[in-house]
């Protein structure tokens, strides 16, 4: 699945830098909404700072040729997805509920563990999935660019986008031009990667003057902006769906849709589109998805539209974002969420269908949402991957019970609970959970000797925590090297059996009051 809050990403910056240095290449960077609300954290700016202009200026200073706004494609995704939703409701073209499809980790999770849901997933590509082929077709035509020279780069908060752009079917532009091997999007770099590149180049981010996006695919509505928040895709789509159903602008309540906003893992609402009443849900986190689907198994048909994101808070909490959440927790995510909602509220155009550059795109190229050309370039299909499990996917659909956490004056420990460990195959990267590694990897079929235990690590300086076979080469928060990391172990009191986790055992057992010498590492 998505390496949510991953220790580090597989870097692609060197490939992008090489393209920038190549005079035969035209480097186009498209920036996701959540990047501009978190990038400033990497340079010491206030949490939730909206740094869109500085972000564009930074990329221009790094030498890229064009900087475009993926919010433009978010508006495009809304038009396609809302149109598909209305068709499902009005004409029964596909089953309800319709699930969102813009989160690549959720898509792969559904393909692997819930293949029966695939007909319910919107076929609309994610904003990055739509931006790629549109740049290499429409944008290239308008500006007279050779699409073979274009290096399409997505700047995202998400590490799973690196997988998404390499899905076999993400080659619509190549098929359009009949150029085998051409990919829609060529590289993905995360917020952290971009910040590291800027630091390496000696850029003083805070002093940069704001710069605008390049024209043609740089306009976006407030609906595109809030795509980065959990509940944002739902709110944006409902604004357009209301217009599609009634022919009128949505009422004011649709521009601050409280029932779908917030940090609760599962939120539900009843929404009226004129005379049409829809039951909707917003979910983030795969464990919450399991819980929702298990609890609503017999009532799922009552819902019309369900948004799913895997990261906490949505894309603003993506695995490629600055790691401040390790220290500041949910408070930082809320700052980012509020920053995007503030930006939405500031814009004159808050509906995707009001985007004039997007109107021009449909008039001059796609024709209309869900047109034959739009279906070819902007929509996709999904693959049943459940065979990778080597067993019935149903056995993975039972929600796990979480163990709670206690905070003591000494350090954080967990209540006694599941002793399951995580193991990683050195060959294919498959992750297995169990007390011991599996006898055989279900993907590459190597035996248990090829598995390493995934451990937990804590930085002694800033208390950042992460998981990995080895500690990270550098702490993403305080930038100390791996020697500053200690393994977090499970400890058990020999007298009373009390269990806890920490770098060291507690000074005193809270149950039998024996000192730390009575604790053994398990």
Residue spans for each PLM region:
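Cysteine-centered iron-sulfur cluster-binding motifs in ferredoxin-type domains/subunits
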Residues: 1-5, 310, 426-440, 460-476, ...
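Iron-sulfur cluster-binding cysteine motifs and their immediate structural context
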Residues: 1-13, 438-449, 472, 476-483, ...
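Short domain-boundary/entry signatures in modular proteins, especially
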Residues: 8-12, 420, 451-458, 485-490
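Iron-sulfur-associated redox domains of electron-transfer enzymes in respiratory
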Residues: 9-416
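Residues immediately within or flanking Cys/His clusters that coordinate Zn2+
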Residues: 96, 155, 305-308, 422, ...
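Generic recognition of long tandem-repeat/solenoid scaffolds
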Residues: 267-274, 425, 459, 491-494
């Amino acid at each position: 699945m998505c390496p949510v809050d991953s220790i580090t990403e597989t870097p692609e910056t060197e490939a992008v830098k090489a393209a920038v240095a190549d005079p035969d290449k035209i480097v186009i960077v498209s920036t996701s909404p959540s990047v501009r609300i978190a990038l400033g954290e990497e340079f010491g700016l206030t949490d939730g700072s909206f740094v869109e202009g500085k972000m564009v200026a930074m990329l221009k200073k790094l030498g890229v040729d064009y900087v475009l706004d993926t919010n433009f494609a978010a508006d495009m995704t809304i038009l396609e997805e809302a149109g598909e939703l209305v068709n499902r409701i009005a004409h029964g073209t596909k089953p309800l509920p319709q699930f969102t499809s813009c989160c690549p980790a959720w898509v792969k999770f559904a393909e692997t563990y819930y293949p029966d849901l695939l007909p319910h997933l919107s076929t609309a590509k994610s904003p990055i999935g739509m931006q790629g082929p549109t740049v290499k077709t429409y944008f290239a035509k308008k500006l007279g660019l050779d699409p073979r020279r274009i290096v399409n780069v997505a700047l995202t908060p998400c590490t799973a986008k690196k997988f998404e752009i390499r899905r076999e079917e993400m080659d619509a532009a190549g098929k359009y031009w009949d150029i085998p091997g051409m990919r829609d999007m060529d590289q993905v770099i995360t917020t952290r990667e971009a910040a590291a590149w800027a630091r390496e180049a000696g850029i003083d981010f805070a002093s940069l003057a704001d710069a605008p996006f390049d024209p043609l695919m740089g306009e976006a509505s407030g609906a595109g902006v809030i795509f980065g928040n959990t509940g944002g895709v739902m709110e944006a789509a409902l604004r357009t769906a209301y217009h599609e159903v009634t022919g009128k602008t949505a009422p004011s309540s649709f521009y601050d849709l409280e029932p779908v906003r917030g940090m609760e893992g599962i939120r539900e609402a009843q929404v009226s589109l004129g005379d049409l009443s829809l039951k909707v849900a917003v979910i983030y986190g795969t464990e919450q998805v399991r819980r929702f689907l298990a609890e609503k198994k017999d009532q799922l048909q009552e819902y019309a539209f369900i948004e799913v994101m895997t990261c906490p808070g949505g894309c603003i909490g993506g695995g490629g974002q600055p790691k401040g959440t390790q220290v500041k927790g949910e408070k930082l995510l809320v700052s980012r969420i509020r920053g995007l909602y503030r930006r939405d509220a500031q814009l004159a155009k808050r509906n995707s269908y009001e985007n004039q550059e997007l109107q021009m795109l449909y008039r001059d190229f796609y024709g209309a949402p869900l047109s034959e050309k739009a279906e070819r370039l902007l929509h996709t299909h999904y693959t049943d991957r459940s065979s990778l499990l080597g067993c019935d996917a149903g056995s993975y659909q039972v929600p796990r019970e979480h163990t709670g956490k206690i905070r003591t004056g000494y350090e954080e420990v967990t209540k006694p609970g599941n002793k399951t460990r995580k193991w990683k195959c050195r060959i294919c990267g498959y992750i297995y959970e169990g007390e011991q590694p599996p006898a055989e990897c279900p993907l590459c079929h190597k035996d248990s000797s090829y598995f390493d235990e995934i451990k937990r690590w804590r930085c002694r300086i800033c208390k950042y925590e992460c998981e990995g076979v080895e500690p990270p080469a550098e702490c993403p928060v305080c930038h100390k090297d791996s020697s500053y990391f200690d393994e977090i172990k499970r400890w058990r009191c020999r007298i009373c059996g009390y269990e806890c986790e920490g770098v060291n055992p507690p000074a005193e057992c809270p149950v039998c009051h024996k000192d730390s010498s009575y604790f053994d590492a398990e």
